[in-house]
Structure formats: C-alpha cells, structure tokens
From Swiss-Prot:
Function as written in the Swiss-Prot or TrEMBL entry: The RuvA-RuvB-RuvC complex processes Holliday junction (HJ) DNA during genetic recombination and DNA repair. Endonuclease that resolves HJ intermediates. Cleaves cruciform DNA by making single-stranded nicks across the HJ at symmetrical positions within the homologous arms, yielding a 5'-phosphate and a 3'-hydroxyl group; requires a central core of homology in the junction. The consensus cleavage sequence is 5'-(A/T)TT(C/G)-3'. Cleavage occurs on the 3'-side of the TT dinucleotide at the point of strand exchange.
Sequence similarity: Belongs to the RuvC family.
Entry protein name: Crossover junction endodeoxyribonuclease RuvC
Source organism, top-level taxon: Bacteria
Protein species of origin: Porphyromonas gingivalis (strain ATCC BAA-308 / W83)
Amino acid sequence: MSPKERIIMGVDPGTILMGYGMLHVVGNTPRLMAMGVIRLEKFDNHYIRLKRIFDRITGLIDEFLPDEMAIEAPFFGKNVQSMLKLGRAQGVAMAAALARDIPITEYAPMRIKQAITGNGNASKEQVAGMLQRYLRIPDEQMLPEMDATDGLAAAVCHFFQTSGPMARSGGSAVKNWKDFVNRNPDKVR
C-alpha cells in the first residue's frame, strides 16, 4: 500500500503581489512543488486585480490539483482601506478554491511564523531561511519576493497542523523549533 499523498496550496493574499506555494506530501514527508507570486502592480483598477487573482488562482488549482488550501488571514495593523482591499483579495482567492470544492483553512500570520520558526514575531527573512533549510530548497529556487515564501509558509504550517505527530496523537502543539526538532529528528539534518 502506498503512503497517502496530498497537495497543499498555501496563499499569502495581497493586492500588489500575491504569494503562493505548492507542497506535495507523501505519507508524512513534504516536498516543494512550486512557489511564486502573482504580480498585480500593473493593474490600476482594483476590480481588474480581483479578476486577475481569481483567474490565476483558478489556473494554479487546475495545474497542480491541490487537495487543500491554507491561506494567511489579513493582518489587522493596516489602515481600513488597505484591510478592505486585502480582505477582498483573500475572499477572491478563497472563492476560486471553493469553486473547485477545495477545503480552506485560514491561519493568523503569527501562527504561521510560530509554526515555521518557533517565534510568532519572526521576520520574513527568518521564515524564508527556515523553509529553505526544512524543505532543502536550493538557493537558485529561492525567490527575491518574500510573498512567495509567505505563501509556502502557510502550506507548511497547515502540513504541521494536520500531519505532525501532535496532530496524529492529539497531543500538545509544538512550542518552538527546538521542541519540533526533538519530536521530529528524522525531519531535520
């Protein structure tokens, strides 16, 4: 019997750049399939940007056939207009997944950072570095846009929440990176 396979799509919503990452999981082993950004800066009209988000997310879903979507929740430190636009962008990405019957899980930015680095206040660079080490991503595959690794981080966070030893055993959550390494020595070298 082959190990269970699934594909997790992670999304970091944005109205200028929207990051995404695709994670292929076989059994309990994740592997990077793809990551990238959807560039929206050339569109002046917000509604055209929303259509572009829907079209590109739908295209990625049709290309990679994810089983689940993990999406970062909007950060509440921005102004009201920014929050409204970001919420619309997130909603359109979610609608694209729902149109293809893909279940969605939303994670707070702090929760994603905590899951990846053990520190809910980690920088984008720290998150990217930890993902690169954990998934063994070669330097040439790393993108300069941190939105891509933020999207991938949402997928990896979802993997940890649904596939890790604590998810299977119903035990307590991993508290930090050291705790994760101690519980998962086979995942880190």
